[in-house]
Amino acid sequence: KHFDNMARATSLKTLEIAMRMDDIEDLPFPVGTVLTRDEIEELHRYNLHDVIATIYFYVRCIPEIEFREVLTKRYDRNFMNHNDTKIGKDYLIMKLEESGVKCFIKTPTGRIPRQTLRPSIKLGDVIFPYVKLEHPEFRRIHETLAAKTITETKGSIKDLTCIVDGLSYKFGTGGLHASDDCKIFKADDEYAIEMRDVTSYYPSMAIVNNLRPLHLGDQFPLIYGDMFKQRRSYPKGTPENAMLKLALNGTYGDSNNIYSPFYDPFFCMQITLNGQLLLCMLVEQLIKTPNLRMININTDGVGFIYPRKYRSHVDAVCGWWEKLTLLGLETEEYSLFAQRDCNNYIGVEV
């Protein structure tokens, strides 16, 4: 939808499939064919179909185009060809620099981003002191991580897994993942299916724990936290809400980007490791509920099926976790939950 896009070479036919068009056609004649009059008419019809598909794609892009037009006019800078991540990053940089936080160093050849380089990171220094785990397998993961020193973040916690109540939990820099694969779960009068997702997990964790890339100083969490509050004041669907969401969510990803002014791998590991371990703390308390079964854990939330008569207990456990972490949990209830794996599922909301 914009030129700064890994998929910009995607063919029109692939777009037609993605847009679920009823009729997808290929060129009706080999390239270079000398056409008859009837074949020319057929080619005109084929070309018209492609024009309609192109217009359809344009219409699908109008909200994003208008979003960028509003931002370009409002902030007097060209956002038209920015991808979503770059929109958020540039907005946060703009706000930091307005507050006197330098994000770049000027040199005779241009500017270079300010960064915090880390020759090595002791993961024991990264983990929050209030992370306490009870289940032997989760404790093993905690102890393994705490004893580890890394020199780069990529692949640093690859292939780290444990099995709890028959479910395999996979840890990594991309977050915690687990799922009861290739299953269909149905709620009824006795059992409920719920997802408890952490509200804006990574941004919220950075804010409540006062985390920041070291080189950006004490102003960063103040500005970041203020942006979080501002976003909640704008209705969903407004350009302001979308802009602030992109700015908040893009910071974590850029904290591990060597070309970014947010680069600080210690900050990156603080968020991803604690994010996973805090979810484990929630899981190990929830599974104490009789007949509660975890079915899906994916980076920022947990899904489970459990007897409805224990709802007050489940709510109390979630309330305890919220009070401990200062993070919020949102609840979605499903009548049916069918999944291939933790990233591919269909949920029918109640």
Feature map (PLM): residue ranges:
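Helical catalytic core of nucleic-acid polymerases
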Residues: 6-9, 27-34, 155-284, 288-289, ...
